[in-house]
Amino acid sequence: MAIRKHKPTTPGRRGSSVADFVEITRTTPEKSLVRPLPKKGGRNNTGRITTRHKGGGHKRQYRVIDFRRHDKDGVDAKVAHIEYDPNRTARIALLHYVDGTKRYIIAPNRLQQGDVVESGPNADIKPGNNLPLRNIPVGTVLHAVELRPGGGAKLARSAGASVQLVAREGKYGQLRLPSGEIRNVDVRCRATIGEVGNAEQSNINWGKAGRNRWKGVRPTVRGVVMNPVDHPHGGGEGKTSGGRHPVNPNGKPEGRTRRPNKESDKLIVRRRRTGKNKR
């Protein structure tokens, strides 16, 4: 993938860029692997906004991705196409298995049309192959990693993401995550070899607010610039600080949303670097 920069023909295109999509080999998805994806606009079943800044955007179809691959152990699959997926930053690969089944997977870096991939404990160590952590050499770069055996891939699924298997002790393998955190994961959990492709995605300059609207993202407006009828921080003469601890439009406290005593915290070997310690 490469980034194509636009010429400054209009203010919105000045400085903006777009992916060249050179790796895409087909523009229409596999019909049997798409599902309707109705828009919710951030509303729940009662019609109230539960997630702000969502709405509009281009119509999409959901591509069903195989995040498990357990049931295809020992069955070879040929990469038929590399496709665009509007629901994620990574590209997806359409696999044609020798038994006639078709599946989508996250497309790792350097995976190309015509390659053959496989899954199972005896698979080769090459991009796109899926194995349990107990069968992967220490030091290997991975993506689409399970957190629980059979639970499906949860870690390192977005464009350019990867984790590294840095050690293996007993029933746990130690993974270095993109944040710098080192975490124990059961060696029965599966992972796919290689890093996720489309790493240049993070370098795209969207250029104008309208391109965000195409993605279904609405503007983010601070509460302190609203009126009192719209937000607890609104109103006042001139600039104000809000006058209270940060709250959401419903008056509930905002910030610090992560539980400090999660059960899975005991699996963390070294915490991610935060604040001044990031360097």
From Swiss-Prot:
SMART domains for this protein: Ribosomal_L2, Ribosomal_L2_C
Molecular functions per Gene Ontology: rRNA binding; structural constituent of ribosome; transferase activity
Keyword Ribosomal protein attributed: yes
Lineage: superkingdom: Bacteria
Segments for region (Disordered): 30-59, 225-279
InterPro entries xref list: NA-bd_OB-fold, Rib_uL2_dom2, Ribosomal_uL2, Ribosomal_uL2_bac/org-type, Ribosomal_uL2_C, Ribosomal_uL2_CS, Ribosomal_uL2_dom3, Ribosomal_uL2_RNA-bd_dom
One annotated Gene Ontology cellular component of this protein: large ribosomal subunit
Keyword field: Ribonucleoprotein, Ribosomal protein, RNA-binding, rRNA-binding
A Pfam family that the UniProt record links to this protein: Ribosomal_L2_C
Biological process terms in GO annotation: cytoplasmic translation
Residue stretches of biased makeup (Basic residues): 50-59, 269-279
Ranges of Basic and acidic residues composition bias in the record: 253-268
Keyword Transmembrane among UniProt keywords: no
PANTHER family hit by this protein: LARGE RIBOSOMAL SUBUNIT PROTEIN UL2M, RIBOSOMAL PROTEIN L2
Subunit and partners: Part of the 50S ribosomal subunit. Forms a bridge to the 30S subunit in the 70S ribosome.
Family stated for the protein in its record: Belongs to the universal ribosomal protein uL2 family.
NCBIfam families associated with the record: rplB_bact (TIGR01171)
Function: One of the primary rRNA binding proteins. Required for association of the 30S and 50S subunits to form the 70S ribosome, for tRNA binding and peptide bond formation. It has been suggested to have peptidyltransferase activity; this is somewhat controversial. Makes several contacts with the 16S rRNA in the 70S ribosome.
Record protein name field: Large ribosomal subunit protein uL2
Gene: rplB
